[in-house]
Amino acid sequence: MKEKERTYIAIDLKSFYASVECAERGLDPLTTNLVVADTSRTAKTICLAVSPSLKAYGIPGRARLFEVEQKVREVNIERRQKIQKREFTGESTDERELAENPELELQYIAATPRMALYIEYSVRIYRIYLKYVAPEDIHVYSIDEVFIDATAYLRTYGMTAKELAAKMIRDVLEQTGITAAAGIGTNLYLCKIAMDIMAKRVQPDKNGAVSYTHLRAHETEA
């Protein structure tokens, strides 16, 4: 008898440490320019996280602090040239404000790492997953990433894998302010690929909550 095709969901919390710091400050993690780094060290210190809006300027997720400072300077030189003024009228760490007002200087928040707080958030989010699936069907890959065997739950909830992923992630967003990307696949490898290579490149939906990509085994065959 042919074995039933299984469905796995991989969930990754976007720029997790940076998103937690934004959530703690009541800021939007998708539009706030923020890095998590210990500024008491040298400029060569590695940022533990970079917010999505700063990454959009070409700053990598594990940049050194001096790379962030250099890129911000470059961006501000370009902004000043466009307005043809020597001085900015103000500054902002929010991309929406910066887009609306070219005369504002780009700034960013440097948040000191708080590992105990990030672990606390991770535990809270894991408990949210437990509202939908049993612990034996959740594999914790890292502090910000899990794999879920959703096979048995799709019929129970009368949902597609995409709908179940959306429900869980929107719950996480509402309860914690943290956004995520999800990948769906017929095995762990495919859902990981769907999330890492495809879903993370898609802009969050209208709720700012989730992007999804679904890969099946036959779709990857030559």
Tell me what each language-model feature is.
Residues 217-222:
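A short, hydrophobic C-terminal helix/tail in secreted or cell-surface proteins
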